[in-house]
Amino acid sequence: MLQYSKKKVSLNFFPVRLLSYKMTRISDAIFKDHRKLQSDYQNIKSANDYDTATRWQNQFVWELARHSVGEEIVVYPKFEKYLGEEGKEMAEKDRHEHQLVKEMLYKFQSMKANQSNFIPALDELMESLQKHIDEEEQHDIPFLEKHLSEEESLHMASSFERTKKFVPTHSHPSAPNKPPFETVAGLFAAPIDKLRDMMEKWP
């Protein structure tokens, strides 16, 4: 195991219902992504060599970049649509938290696993991300689910998964974080990111 830092980030794991893809609610889709990100983080921390750490770094960046933009395009507009003024405040709060995470991810994605500040940068990023995850899983997403029919929730989950296929796979903190401008910016950035992905190493 690579010994960069002894800092531990507390990861909270909330249960995800085991449903088929066609019957996944939006909360299940989002929480499943959160579990993947926590797993990627732990795999980086437990890597026995720099090559393995780099592969999981690429996976973590790929997952987090797509997840963040997917939420901003599909989920946060629904906060504003269904949850009134509180929903608007939630959306702005979450966008602000995403922006901070994107800026940290932008720095982390260009770092090398053998740099002395590689793991400290990851820990700082994960600490902020975990706080955001806790808020979404304990309050924001359950609150939204209460205002959605099952059909609406299933449709949102499908849109969320579909959107992630077309968005950038690396962090672009200077890009817009609201649709439709974020959608347009993503369509331009995504092809370049996907070419970059072809040159990366993966788990």
From Swiss-Prot:
Subcellular location: Mitochondrion
Ligand binding (Fe cation 2): E97, H172
Organism per entry: Schizosaccharomyces pombe (strain 972 / ATCC 24843)
Keyword annotations of the record: Iron, Metal-binding, Mitochondrion
Top-level taxonomic group: Eukaryota
Name of the protein this chain belongs to: Uncharacterized hemerythrin-like protein C869.06c
Keyword Oxidoreductase in annotation: no
Binding sites annotated in the UniProt record for Fe cation 1: H34, E97
InterPro entries: Hemerythrin-like
Molecular function GO labels: cation binding; metal ion binding
Cellular component annotations (GO), alphabetically ordered: mitochondrion
Main location: mitochondrion
Family: Belongs to the hemerythrin family.
